[in-house]
């Protein structure tokens, strides 16, 4: 999407040029310095290495989601030739097999006491951040219960940064339909749970559902609002933050 600057009289438009990041490290530094602003997460560690099923895996940024009491793995990508599903589940599988290492790293880095029982491992997730994803990669995340998110980041000549999540398009299929073909997907799917709006609605009375749907439609009409279901509630978010009225 092209962006433009306008003069004070709003008559002449000048296109704002994109200035691509040359290195993954540049993106990593920017995101880590603004982790709470961009994603609402706490920074734990850079370049954290853990044992995978085949080889050791390097986590670019390890973060913690205090709201959901869960760890979040962040990977930065320049190369477009990788499977977001296969790689994402490989990291989640490694996390679940090395829980003690994550607790220890958090306690040392944050100088806090986090107990293993205080972490909700079912809410673990992976975030890939890139300047652009292929259409195949965007299609690959179109499962309703995929604990993987894609975010695109771009830098422009007027010192503007855009940061946008690739949204799933009416996803109805479950990742469990392909879990038998991938041991990591199969193992992780037994422990990590992604909740949907329908999951939350099933447990409330029909009368309350009607009230909710009425409010839901009014909130969505405001524009640029996304629904995020969690283990305990459904949130309406704007730019990654829960929607509130001031």
Question: Positions of the model-derived regions?
Answer:
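Charged, terminal alpha-helix-loop-beta segments
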Residues: 1-246
């Amino acid at each position: 999407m092209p962006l433009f600057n306008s003069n004070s009289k709003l008559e002449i438009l000048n296109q704002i040029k994109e200035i691509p990041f040359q290195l993954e490290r540049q993106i990593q530094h920017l995101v880590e310095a603004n982790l709470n602003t961009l994603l609402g997460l706490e920074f734990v560690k850079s370049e954290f290495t853990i044992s995978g099923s085949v080889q050791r895996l390097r986590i670019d940024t390890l973060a913690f989601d205090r709201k959901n009491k869960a760890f979040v793995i962040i990977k930065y990508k320049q190369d477009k030739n990788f499977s977001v599903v296969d790689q994402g589940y490989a990291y989640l599988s490694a996390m679940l097999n090395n829980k003690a290492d994550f607790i220890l790293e958090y306690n040392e880095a944050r100088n806090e006491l986090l107990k293993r029982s205080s972490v909700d491992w079912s809410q673990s997730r992976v975030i890939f951040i890139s300047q652009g994803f292929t259409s195949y990669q965007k299609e690959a995340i179109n499962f309703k219960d995929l604990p993987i998110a894609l975010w695109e980041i771009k830098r422009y000549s007027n010192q503007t940064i855009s940061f946008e999540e690739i949204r799933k398009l009416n996803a109805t299929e479950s990742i469990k339909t392909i879990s038998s073909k991938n041991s990591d997907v199969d193992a992780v799917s037994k422990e990590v749970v992604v909740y949907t709006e329908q999951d939350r609605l099933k447990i409330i009375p029909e009368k309350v559902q009607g009230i909710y749907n009425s409010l839901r439609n009014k909130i969505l009409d405001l524009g640029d609002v996304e629904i995020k279901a969690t283990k305990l509630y459904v949130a309406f978010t704007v730019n990654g933050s829960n929607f509130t009225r001031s």
